[in-house]
A protein has these predicted regions:
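C-terminal catalytic "cap/lid" subdomain
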Residues: 1-284
Length: 284
């Protein structure tokens, strides 16, 4: 929260997205254990996502509010439980790849597949797991509320964990669906929808590198959209589960009218905003 407060103190209006990687899995696992041993109902995946937004949002808004108060800054902070619409025809639904929940034996996995329509896979010799789709985010359902809060001077925490995935219910409304949306893609969409001047991705490294971990490793200070696309296309620079989606998210943002993106680690956000470190990605 200190790093976000630094941005706010420097005059930025801030909207915050966050992941929910382990937490949503723990919520699901607790519900599966409670169902198995206590006969309680299992919590659907979309509701697990909502639970995680509430809990993580509460922690973020409280710690950020406390930090702002300690600096004498009067600025409200609020979390919006956020639904993100995906396309029910997204090809990700035909090829679910995200493992979630508990390990099962084959018999249990096959039973759930038959009774509940789950997609299940054998996971590296460790047992069977459910897999769900990771579709692309298309629309932030609560975007008007988010915009109104930002306009009123509120720091908004939104699209937590990539948002609660929902599909069109064919009546103009929404219906929750079992999926996981990439947090970087959802934050990229949010940045475009609020017309952000800067899209900051806070991660574990100070700068982005090409040839990461190799003798010819090179840390990048500033690259263009075209360079980012070329490096991504080469397929050898960015790890699939970590940096690659962040670069993809930046590309989506810049290709759809975004102005500038910045990737760095939390403790260097202040310095990176002053141009002293981090990797900036610009349109040209």
């Amino acid at each position: 929260s200190k790093h976000k407060a630094d941005m706010i103190e420097a005059g930025w209006d801030v909207a915050v997205g966050h992941g929910n990687g382990p937490q949503v899995g723990f919520i699901l696992r607790r519900s599966e254990i409670a169902a198995k041993y206590e006969g309680m109902h299992e919590v659907p995946l979309d509701v697990c996502g909502a639970d995680s937004q509430g809990a993580i949002g509460y922690m973020l808004q409280q710690t950020l509010q406390n930090e702002l108060v300690s600096r004498g800054i009067k600025k409200p902070v609020a979390t919006v439980v956020t639904q993100v619409k995906v396309d029910k025809d997204d090809k990700a639904f035909q090829n679910p790849t995200k493992p979630i929940g508990s390990f099962m034996d084959e018999a249990e996995a096959k039973r759930r597949q038959a009774e509940l329509g789950w997609n299940v896979v054998e996971d590296a010799g460790r047992g069977w797991r459910r897999v769900v789709a990771s579709p692309l985010p298309m629309e932030v359902v609560e975007i008007e509320s988010v915009r109104a809060l930002i306009a009123a001077g509120t720091v908004v925490i939104t699209v937590g964990g990539g948002g609660i995935p929902v599909i069109d219910n064919n009546k103009g409304g929404c219906l929750g669906t079992a999926a996981v949306i990439d947090k970087d893609f959802a934050s990229s969409l949010l940045a475009r929808l609020i017309n952000a001047d800067l899209f900051v991705i806070s991660t574990a490294v100070e700068k982005v590198a090409i040839n990461y971990g190799k003798p010819n490793e090179k840390w990048l200070d500033k690259i263009t959209l075209a360079e980012a696309k070329a490096y991504l296309a080469e397929g050898t620079h960015f790890a699939k589960g970590s940096m690659a989606p962040k670069i993809q998210a930046v590309i989506m943002y810049l290709e759809n009218g975004g102005k500038e993106a910045l990737i760095t680690n939390p403790e260097n956000i202040g310095r990176a905003l002053r141009g002293e470190t981090g990797t900036r990605i610009v349109r040209e």
